[in-house]
């Protein structure tokens, strides 16, 4: 078998196609990473050239190969209690404010992308340990990702010792079981408290099907988008949030260069982006 080469033109064609489907744009600096994953897919599907493979990718009726490529090219690295200051703001300020404005109503929290589950499960554990009102308030936690393989892993709730390194021993003993290989598995009650669903943030219809949200965590995803995709994602989040809802981004991400649609919400320990109640304005729009 001749060595398959991905030319500059091939890379650009694939990059444009992948961007169209996912909103994720690969800079030239990611070329080696993309080429390596594509060559693996070409070999696994037994194609003899990039051209033949790319035709197969675009026109396969089931879309299974596109999903396989998405799974291969999305980055999934996270751990429990990452950016814990946002979780502290959630239980100390955000949820209480929502309850004041909408007493007795269901509160919905969305983790997007949820990766292998550390973020949504962290939310569950933090609520259990630090929000006394949890027993009186109905909360639904939805976790989404574009990667079907990582969603299956998340639902299993099995994590490495590195992934749980920030958890106190009391939480490990209370909510996890230690497996023979040194990994940790969440107990059934915790795993069943999160609803996992595949969602492509670039597909507005898929997002709308999830329904209205009160809090959205979208951390360290928008850095992989270009300006247009970032703006579209932020507008989609704004549409999904109930008035009074809050969006949390990653610590290295800022709304200031994306959109002015949200209002900055400075909590005691972190910063979020707020969809104001009608007729109210907490802080100036388009902050950092």
UniProtKB/Swiss-Prot annotation:
CheR-type methyltransferase domain segment(s): 1-280
Protein name in the entry: Chemotaxis protein methyltransferase 2
Catalytic activity: L-glutamyl-[protein] + S-adenosyl-L-methionine = [protein]-L-glutamate 5-O-methyl ester + S-adenosyl-L-homocysteine
Keyword entries, A-Z: Methyltransferase, S-adenosyl-L-methionine, Transferase
GO biological process, one term: methylation
Enzyme Commission number(s) from the entry: 2.1.1.80
InterPro entries the record matches: Bact_Chemotaxis_MeTrfase, Chemotaxis_MeTrfase_CheR, CheR_C, CheR_MeTrfase, CheR_N, CheR_N_sf, SAM-dependent_MTases_sf
Pfam families assigned to the protein according to its UniProt record, in alphabetical order: CheR, CheR_N
């Amino acid at each position: 078998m001749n060595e398959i080469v991905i030319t500059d033109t091939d890379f650009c064609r694939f990059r444009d196609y992948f961007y169209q489907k996912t909103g994720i744009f690969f800079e030239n600096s990611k070329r080696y990473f993309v080429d390596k994953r594509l060559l693996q897919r070409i070999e696994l599907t037994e194609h003899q050239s990039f051209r033949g493979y790319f035709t197969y990718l675009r026109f396969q009726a089931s879309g299974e190969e596109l999903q396989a490529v998405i799974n291969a090219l999305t980055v999934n690295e996270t751990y429990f209690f990452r950016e814990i200051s946002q979780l502290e703001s959630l239980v100390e300020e955000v949820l209480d404010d929502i309850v004041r404005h909408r007493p007795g109503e269901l509160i919905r929290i969305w983790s997007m992308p949820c990766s292998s589950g550390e973020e949504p499960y962290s939310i569950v554990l933090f609520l259990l340990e630090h929000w006394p009102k949890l027993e009186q308030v109905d909360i639904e936690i939805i976790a989404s990702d574009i990667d079907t393989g990582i969603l299956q892993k998340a639902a299993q709730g099995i994590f490495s010792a590195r992934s749980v390194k920030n958890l106190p021993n009391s939480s490990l003993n209370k909510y996890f079981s230690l497996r023979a290989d040194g990994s940790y598995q969440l107990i059934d009650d915790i795993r069943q408290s999160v609803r996992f669903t595949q969602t492509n943030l670039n597909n507005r219809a898929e997002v709308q099907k999830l329904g209205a949200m009160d809090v959205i965590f979208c951390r360290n995803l928008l850095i992989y988008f270009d300006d247009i995709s970032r703006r579209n994602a932020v507008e989609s989040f704004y549409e999904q949030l109930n008035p009074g809802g809050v969006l949390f981004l990653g610590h290295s991400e800022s709304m200031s260069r994306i959109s002015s649609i949200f209002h900055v919400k400075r909590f005691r320990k972190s910063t979020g982006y707020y969809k104001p109640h009608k007729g109210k304005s907490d802080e100036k729009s388009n902050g950092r």
